[in-house]
């Protein structure tokens, strides 16, 4: 029904404003459909520790559930797919798949492998950056610069959400 008890974000907040905006985009997207969702239910955890994203995120999610036993409908947002792996490991280890959704950033191999393995019921999406396609938009932009044309100061490919519905279009199962 779309109702949440909490959003738990595990990210490298010390990495800067752009990353903070990416994480807040998860919240903002949800609030487009459910505008009454309180920002007080968004819990942000720094995830730049030395143990790595997978281990850190697993601990963050496990500790959050332990400390908030009455929160049963939770979205975990991570700034990369390694964090998504940690969240999935925690959720599966606690036997709470029906209580969680994971949204990550990257659309990289860890996400692709888990979706192809049928884990899309929990890990529902990852923002795809597709760095392997950067040349498709960078080369024309660079040629315009070399030819003296006015170009935007910054360029970025369009990002989108990879899900079980579209993953084979971009990354077919091997």
Where are these regions (language model features)?
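Extracytoplasmic substrate-binding proteins
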Residues: 1-37
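Short beta-strand elements at the ligand-binding edges of bilobed clamshell
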Residues: 11-12, 118-132
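Hydrophobic alpha-helical
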Residues: 26, 41-114
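Hydrophobic alpha-helical segments within soluble ligand-binding/sensing domains
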Residues: 1-5, 21-22, 54-58, 84, ...
């Amino acid at each position: 029904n779309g109702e949440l008890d909490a959003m738990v974000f595990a990210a490298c907040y010390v990495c800067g404003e752009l990353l903070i905006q990416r994480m807040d985009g998860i919240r903002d997207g949800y609030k487009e459909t459910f505008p009454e969702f309180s920002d007080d239910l968004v819990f942000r955890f720094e995830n730049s520790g030395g143990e790595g994203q997978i281990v850190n995120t697993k601990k963050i999610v496990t500790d959050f559930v332990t400390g908030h036993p009455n929160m049963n409908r939770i979205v975990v947002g991570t700034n990369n797919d390694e964090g998504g792996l940690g969240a999935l490991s925690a959720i599966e280890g606690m036997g709470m798949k029906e209580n969680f959704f994971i949204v990550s950033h990257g659309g990289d191999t860890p996400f692709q492998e888990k979706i192809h393995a049928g884990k899309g019921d929990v890990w529902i999406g990852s923002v795809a950056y597709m760095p392997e396609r950067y040349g498709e938009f960078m080369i024309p932009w660079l040629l315009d610069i070399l030819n003296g044309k006015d170009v935007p100061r910054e360029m970025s490919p369009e990002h989108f959400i990879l899900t079980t519905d579209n993953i084979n279009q971009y990354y077919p199962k091997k």
